[in-house]
Amino acid sequence: MQNKGLIKFFAILFALVSIYQLSFTFVASKVKNDAKSFANGDSEKEVKYLDSIGKEKVFNLGFTNFTFNEVSDKQINKGLDLEGGINVILQISVKDILKGLSNNSKNPVFNKSLADATANKKGNQTYLDAFFDAFDANSNGTVKLASPDIFANRSLQGEGGVDFQMTDAQVKKIISRKVDESVESAFGVLRKRIDKFGVTQPNIQKLGNSGQILVELPGAKDVDRIKKLLQSTAQLEFWETYKIEEIGNFIMAANESLKKTEIKTTEVKPVVKDSLSALLADAKDTAVAKKGNNPLLDKIIAQGGGPVLGLFSPKDTAVINGYFKRADIRILLAGDQRYAKFVWGITSTIKDEKGKAVDAVELYALRGNRDNIPAMSGGVVTDAKDTFDQLGKPAVSMQMDGQGAKSWEELTGRAYTQKSNIAIVLDDVVYSAPGVSSGPISGGRSEISGAFDVTQTKDLANVLRAGKLPAAADIVQSEVVGPSLGQEAIDNGTNSAILGLFIVSLWMMIYYGKAGWFANIALAVNLLFLFGILASIGAVLTLPGIAGIVLTMGTAVDANIIIYERAKEELRAGRTLEEAIKTSYSWRGAMSSITDANVTHILTGAVLFIFGSGPIKGFATTLLIGIITSLFTSIFIARIFIDWNINRKNDLTFVTKFSKNIFTNFHFNFLGMKKWTYLISICIVIISFTSLAINGLDEGTDFVGGRTFQIRFEKPIETETVKAELEKVFDGSAEVKVFGSDNQLKITTKYKVQEPGIQADEEVNKLLFENLKQHYSAGLTYDKFVNAYDGKKVGILQASKVGPTVAEDIKTNAYWAVLGAMAIVFLYLMISYRKWQYSLGAIAAVAHDVIFVLGIYSLCYKFMPFGMEIDQHFIAAILTVIGYSMNDTVIVFDRVREYLAGKTKGTFAEIVNQSINTTMSRTINTSLTMIVVLLIMFVFGGESIRGFIFAMLIGIIVGTYSSLFIATPILVDTISKEDKEKVEITHKEA
């Protein structure tokens, strides 16, 4: 080996750098454990402790010191599946941005294009591109984007803006830039909010130019609070309100009109005695007061007063909103009331007639106008602080600028004179609607009070200070993981990694003896380098990432196996140990096979990295780094010890008594079996396609959208019971499966997954709690059921949501990833082997493997005791199978190419058969180490990745079969008769 000293120098330097980088992870972990001990389960106390020592020196290397914040920045970060917390993807509404840029244009072509873009957006297409396509189709050249009533409006004119003379292509560039600026503005606002929220090491990043923003909050536990914080647009407005006596006649008339379409004769409900029902009591038609005869009024659960029209149950708000949007109801509003805007207040808890605590929400009617503009906008607010009102209750005080102070004085003066109320509205929710009893308020200071707690006022002040979002931000994908579940994942991953390392190391020693020890040392160094690189690049370690590390231990010895097997062959051919080592490490020896196998593997890993997201990207990261470090340690580190052994004149045989005669003089007619293997594989493909057509696949929420909950109970529970209970409240959409132990369920539903905003999320959580709490002992509250906390054992341990548009993007990415990986590998092999027949054989084998795995999943998902969903994890498994199947195939093909170009005697089929037989030890050993580590991961890796590992396990097994019985026979059958005769003539002459 040339430059041995230089390699040793770099290896030692790399090892020292890796240890240095990993030291930060150990120090950070120790400090965090101290914080947990100090907080004793209080997450807020834990965060405050870590914040307080952020600038303190916690790591002294003698020549330099590091603060806790610096140490945290350099550690290996754990993903949410290991740390716990919440991960969301927010979709900034490009539709709202375009409306704003057009000044809410009424142009029919423009608005139809907005609607068409929403309906027809293709997977992986941005909304803006979909809008441009729709506008081109709808306008057909008759309407320009630079029209005065679209984008050539006053607000977009001027330098860098839109003028009337511009073409659509020019306007598109400007609008694209303006949209990017708005998303950037949203990104900045969200970062300000998150920085003040109080979690350690939050992560926020834009996802390409899709208008999507990824937010990760490790360790965050209050789910509903976080979603409110992220989704609030902070659109603060001040509206004048109607009083109940002013709007009461409309409510009466609406109730009468609704009776014609909504009343059910079997419905019997008591009429609540509130101010509205009192109005009704004076009506001439006393029949209206009969129980169950009031579609609108029967839904009132408590009386209102002043600006509050009544209190309703949150579950009825959607129905009532639908009533007020109906044209036949709106027409009942007289005069200026026709512009009235009906909005809800914040949810509070009240006592019903039986004294039971129930949720209630207040209904308000705001004094609207033709342009739907509030009396005052919240843009005048310059500062906001959480404080306490005169009664000592939590509130938020606001300070306005000069213009705002003047407008506020006018507005409060008018309210004082008219004895009316001013509603303080944030994102179409009324937080308070105070009256003005002491005259106009000067100075621009105001206060928001209501049924708040201290946490709510802190968040509200935070949102107002950070500023408003330029458009609505909807959570299109989310995942919530409890810290206890994360600890279980760490334990499972650690156990499987240790056991996998032990088994692989033991096998290498049993099979290769002393040389196996050298491979094991290289494996240990490989793991050090791998973790060192992960720490240095700031990678996030996820559970699939741990699986990638365990797989790396299987692949790390592959190169050693190929080299050792070649060395054994050279020794059997009578060469000296030095000659055998030199040959096996040469391009003519093992290097060509190692290069081709790993390049194909790297290509599929790169595709996985590009198209994957979240944990899957973490898997791809560890896999790619592991391939590179494995190559370095297998080729150079193990070689250093081998050369050291040779220099000491020690014997090295690469075999033990156990393995000495295994696969020696192995002769099997692989090509003679091709008729049977073709028949078997054709039957498998037919069965797979038949099952796919009849049974389909169990597509996960990643591909079809939906909500998934992992819920643990105190004792075993029947899935059918839970399914029947939830189907009643989720409109028939509830799939319930046992997940791991029989007291843990995986519940999937599409109920309201398309509805934006946090209200739908909260409704689903509350419906889950209300319908499942009967299966728990008394004392389980909604907060304990939904939110995460240290030591949580029951309730929702993990929850995820994937919106339908994101699901379509993921599915599109998955198709392109698989097809792209196969195309790239086909091209590489064709270039490397210079014959398309090699590529065809390899791709046919890979396609066979993919179809086989899909067929198994289609046939078995209904009765297997673990999840077999087709999701991002499954696609990662398929791409990994493609890589490893190629690995096996390349080992065989490389020997075939060598023998066909060499002097081996025999017919074409005999030469190819001999090629396959001489690679059996390599093929079986490389596959066996992979199968062993996958089995370990399958048994000990945890329920959440069992289906993912199973796909790889089946794929590796069938991939080994296809390399021997599909790829090579196809290669032989597609080579022309003339080429075969040329080879046979050459070998006879040799």
Where are the predicted features?
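Interfacial helix-loop-helix hairpins and adjacent transmembrane helices
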Residues: M1-S72, I76, K99-P108, L114-D136, ...
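Interfacial segments of transmembrane alpha-helices in multi-pass membrane proteins
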Residues: N3-K4, V396-S397, D401-Q418, I422-A423, ...
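Pore- and gate-forming transmembrane helices of large, multi-pass membrane proteins
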Residues: L190, S484-V504, L523, A573-S613, ...
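Non-transmembrane, solvent-exposed regions of membrane trafficking/translocation machinery
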Residues: L22-V31, D51, K55-F63, V71-G435, ...
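Short helical (or helix-break) motifs at transmembrane helix termini and adjacent helical loops
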Residues: T552-A573, I594, L631-F636, L879-K903, ...
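Small-residue-enriched core segments of transmembrane alpha-helices in multipass membrane transport
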Residues: I12-A15, I424, G516-G538, I549-A556, ...
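Hydrophobic alpha-helical transmembrane segments of membrane transport and translocation systems
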Residues: K8, V525, G532-I533, E569-Y585, ...
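Juxtamembrane "pre-transmembrane" interface segments
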Residues: E216, G444-E447, T455-I503, L767, ...
